[in-house]
């Protein structure tokens, strides 16, 4: 997998490509056309391919960037909103996945394989999402359980087994059920 850009000019191009790709993420993965994204972003196609060899790489990189931004917001909201921050962070991850079918398709299709370059991206995505939720919950186990719940609920919405409203309500309930566990972990950590 290509390295992340290191110079300010490269970072600017990289960001422009990701911003252009965000619109395609709202459609399906089959609608992600790197040539079209190159044109929209004003970045040469060869440069786009250098950073993102496939549409999968592009969509996973977009999601990684979104999670990175969310993690920063989670730090400030956890301090300001306490237990309510947990539901906010988890709900935001849920909505990112539901509202971006191309990203969700990549997450479903890509698997952890030793020699696949998307594996590194998937590891980064998992770490970022777990950290963002763990910051809000102060409990790594609760974070993993909630992220697995998000995955199941996204699939249920996609398969039309649940409405978006029903899935949101279930996710709020899961956060409420796990928030006392997280609050207890915080209290135990402070008293130790």
PLM feature segments, named:
Residues 1, 130-137, 159-192:
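C-terminal peripheral helix-coil segments that are non-catalytic and often amphipathic
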Residues 1-40, 57-60:
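Basic, helix-initiating cap at the start of DNA-binding domains
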Residues 34, 64-71:
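Short, basic, alpha-helical segments at the C-terminal edge of helix-turn-helix-like DNA-binding modules
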Residues 41-52:
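Short hydrophobic/aromatic patch on the recognition helix
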Residues 58-66, 120:
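Alpha-helical DNA-contacting segments of helix-turn-helix folds
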Residues 61, 72-99, 123-124, 146:
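Hydrophobic alpha-helical connector segments
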Residues 88, 109-148, 166-176:
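Amphipathic alpha-helical packing segments from all-alpha helical-bundle domains
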Residues 91-119, 123, 148-159:
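Amphipathic alpha-helical segments used for helix-helix packing
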